[in-house]
Amino acid sequence: MPDHPISAERLLTLAQVAELLTLDVDDVLALLHEGRLRGTRLGTAAQWRIEQSSVGDYVDDQIEETRRMHLWHQSN
């Protein structure tokens, strides 16, 4: 169980995350399965809901990865 309660305001649908990240829904689903995004299946239809903070963490990770790649290319 997470250390913090998850409120409905902090949960996003697959489509919302796909739009925010300019990805296909299938790509967002893959990120969930890879553990790069945090989410859960809710409701009787068991639809995915993704933690908003997880999206921010993913973006931060992508920025850091880009920064490191840039530094690596500069050093070569």
What are these regions (language model features)?
Residues 53-76:
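A short, Lys/Arg-enriched interface patch at domain edges and termini
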Residues 21-49:
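Major-groove DNA-recognition helix of helix-turn-helix-type DNA-binding domains
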Residues 9, 35-40, 48, 66-67, ...:
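Short, intrinsically disordered low-complexity segments
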Residues 2-31, 61:
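Polyanion-binding surface elements
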Residues 15, 35, 52-53:
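Structural detector for helix-capping/boundary residues
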Residues 2, 22, 45, 50, ...:
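Intrinsically disordered, low-complexity regions enriched for glutamine and histidine
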